[in-house]
Amino acid sequence: MTKLAITGATVYPISRPPMAGATLLVGDGKILAVGRVEIPSDAEVVDARGLHLLPGFVDPHTHVGLWGEGDGPPAYDGNEWTSPTTAQVRALDAINPFHVSFADARSAGVTTVQTLPGSGNPIGGEMVVIKTRGRTADEMVLRRPSGLKGALGENPKRLHGQNHKRMPATRMGVAAVIRQFLTRARAYDPEKGRDLGLELARKVLDREIPLRLHAHRADDILTAIRIAREFSIDLSIEHCTEGWMVVDALAEAGYPVTLGPMLGGRSKVETANLTFRNPGILEKAGVHVSLMTDHPFVPIAHHRIQGALAVREGMSEAGALRAMTLNPAEMLGVADRVGSLEPGKDADFVLWSDHPFRARARVLATYIEGQRVYEAKSLS
């Protein structure tokens, strides 16, 4: 077994407090030990004194590899807008593993992402959790399926009601489409004819995967909770821009939320109440919070900046780091593999020149499963 020892860094395991002057020992793509570690004589040693070592960031809501950037509408593979319910489509089938966004992710210290269909349809399709390196999309997969994407609010109203003059054209219609689809899934009998979309929906009803609902506005957030309770399903609330306005309801419901994108203007009516205070307010109320970029809508390279601004506006530093690592890993069902630096987990980690929330901090090296996949300068 080839071993690698990163020595002398300030290590942030996330699952426990930071450790100064610690060592991370890895071998065969896994973490072997963290802390005061006896270094094997045959290990390759990287002297990381003065550096900061963290788990790779986990971005739980992106369109990395799926959504064109700078190449126009023909490359927008995020929304299969031909029908309001498209649970049968799979994000995996549209991922371009050679897309520049994967290199951007690695250079920003993001080693795991969930990539997913867009929010044009009330029922959008199958989501997938992937690592940000690999020669094929299948090689990247960490969990599939990781959820069923759905959407409330303005996007499905506009795309279907306004643009195509069909249901849904109102918030009532959007919720009705979702309810009707889940009701059909309850009655699904594969012996009467196979339906890939209803098969996925049955996984939601059986609580094998969650329904992940796009909801910015407070009333849409409450509708998401209402639907999840009606069908006794697992839910994550995506965006949750006005979550701070219904924080008590979120805390009582107990569903995880994924906040963002926050680094940008209030470009749509649903983001009129966007604030960087949202993460801190929800954290203090005990809500399970993760942060997202929604790449490319906030470039994945700016993920750490959102965390820093959340801290400035009231979130704890430890909470913000957790919201970018272990919390999303837990919410995505992959915390046994990624999200913290613990023995037995994948050796996905990042060496930073400073704490990642400091303005001048930069990624010096990114490792995925013990292999260096990005390097800013020589460290050995």
Stretch-by-stretch model annotation:
Residues T7-P13, A20, E330, E342-S380:
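C-terminal cap of metal-dependent C-N hydrolases
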Residues L51-P117:
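Metal-associated gating/positioning segment near the N- to mid-region
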Residues V128-R226, E230, P296:
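Metal-coordinating catalytic core of metallo-dependent amide/deamination hydrolases
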Residues A91, E154, Y188-T275, S290, ...:
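Active-site core of metal-dependent hydrolases
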Residues A9, L24, G29, G50, ...:
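Divalent metal-coordination and catalytic microenvironments
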Residues E69-G70, Y76-W81, T86-Q88, P210, ...:
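His/Asp/Glu-enriched, well-ordered alpha-helical/loop segment
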Residues G68-I95, T136, A151-L159, K203-L205, ...:
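Active-site gating loops and adjacent loop-to-helix segments of metal-dependent hydrolytic enzymes
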Residues T2, V11-G56:
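Histidine-rich, glycine-flanked metal-binding segment
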